[in-house]
């Protein structure tokens, strides 16, 4: 059953079962959280990262896609680095591509979008930093093939 992920064990399970992550709202500016978190995840996580920003064609030496639908592989998790008013459209797109989960970054809360994602069968982590949680729970994360 889909839910808002809150406990450490749920977070570790979600991070373990996730392989492909789309970072929506990636910036090419090194001082932006989306860039720093993505650089850390590339070096320190088991994730395959895919980047979404219609204003960019490449970022961090990888292709950058205009939308989630443009990514040529199935995405497990959509990690959102956009302002709250943009979250509903990103959640709709995540549902449309069949993502398994949504990660709404630290400082961002959109209960209505979270409820819509859960109703569509997605797990939701909200108001959490994926880098911080991955680093904190690293000993409990067991990547699955």
Predicted stretch roles:
Residues 81-82, 106:
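Glycine-rich, N-terminal phosphate-binding loop of Rossmann-like dinucleotide-binding domains
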Residues 2-75, 88-106, 110-145:
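Structural/interface elements that position substrates and couple domains in central-metabolism enzymes
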């Amino acid at each position: 059953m889909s839910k808002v992920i809150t406990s450490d064990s749920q977070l570790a399970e979600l991070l373990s079962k996730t392989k492909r992550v789309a970072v929506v709202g990636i910036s090419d500016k090194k001082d932006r959280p989306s860039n720093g978190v993505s650089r850390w995840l590339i070096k320190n996580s088991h994730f395959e990262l895919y980047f979404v920003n219609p204003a960019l064609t490449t970022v961090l030496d990888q292709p950058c896609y205009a939308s989630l639908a443009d990514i040529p592989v199935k995405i497990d998790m959509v990690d959102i680095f956009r302002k709250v008013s943009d979250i509903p459209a990103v959640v709709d797109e995540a549902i449309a591509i069949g993502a398994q989960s949504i990660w709404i970054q630290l400082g961002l809360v959109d209960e209505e979008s979270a409820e819509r994602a859960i109703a569509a069968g997605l797990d939701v982590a909200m108001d959490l930093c994926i880098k911080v949680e991955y680093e904190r729970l690293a000993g409990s994360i067991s990547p699955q093939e």
